[in-house]
Regions:
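Residue-level marker of positions within ordered structural domains that often coincide
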Residues: 1, 26, 63, 166
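Bacterial N-terminal signal peptides that target proteins for export
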Residues: 1-9
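Classic N-terminal secretory signal peptides
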Residues: 10-14
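C-terminal motif of bacterial Sec signal peptides marking the signal peptidase cleavage site
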Residues: 17-20
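Short, conserved catalytic or interaction motifs in soluble domains
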Residues: 23
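Short, solvent-exposed recognition patches
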Residues: 28-128
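A short, solvent-exposed beta-edge/loop patch
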Residues: 109-181
Length: 181
């Protein structure tokens, strides 16, 4: 009888081992909730609004991270600093019916065009364009000047958007020595 008990023991561990699987589709684990809540409180936003993205050649500009008009906001800049795109997260929904009715950033007097692209919406108005990604009651917007950042960069940013892990959360926080990374 001891032999079947030994065979059964590893099966008992299986749920424990699988608990951490797929915690973050980008390979890390979600940031500790207490750390995320403290950071969000410091920025003046709700923790569920904090998202990050990853695009080769771009890094987050730490001084830009925080609250902007009740949204979470962060600016990503190119390694050379010549181009930027913004990541904005707010509560709400974006549907085929509402897409063109919602203004695109500061552009309110120009018609917004919408194109469904995978799980996101590609939106354009004047010289601004963005990818808007609905995700469980929030909308993540990746916005840039269409003349400076091409659509492919914004699409990559939209595809990579996710909740931060501990390392990514630390990268959002301003360093204490006054130097950003």
């Amino acid at each position: 009888m001891i032999r079947p008990a030994r065979a059964f023991f590893p099966l008992l561990l299986l749920p424990v081992l699988l608990t951490g699987c797929d915690a973050d589709k980008n390979g890390g684990t979600a940031a500790d909730s207490a750390d995320l809540e403290a950071a969000a409180r410091g920025w003046g936003v709700a923790p569920e609004l904090v998202y990050v993205t990853k695009v080769s050649g771009y890094t987050v500009f730490q001084q830009s991270v925080g609250e902007y008009e009740d949204e979470f906001a962060a600016v990503y800049r190119s390694e050379k600093g010549a181009t930027t795109f913004g990541l904005f997260v707010s509560r709400g929904k974006l549907t085929a019916e509402s897409c063109s009715k919602q203004p695109l950033g500061e552009v309110s007097d120009t018609a917004v065009t919408c194109e469904h692209d995978g799980d996101a919406w590609y939106r354009k108005a004047g010289h601004s364009h963005e990818y808007a990604v609905p995700d469980g009651g929030v909308v993540i917007r990746l916005t840039a000047d269409a003349d400076k950042v091409d659509r492919a960069i914004l699409r990559k940013a939209a595809e990579a958007v996710h909740r931060p892990d501990d390392t990514e959360l630390a990268a959002l926080l301003r360093t204490t020595d006054g130097v950003d990374t």
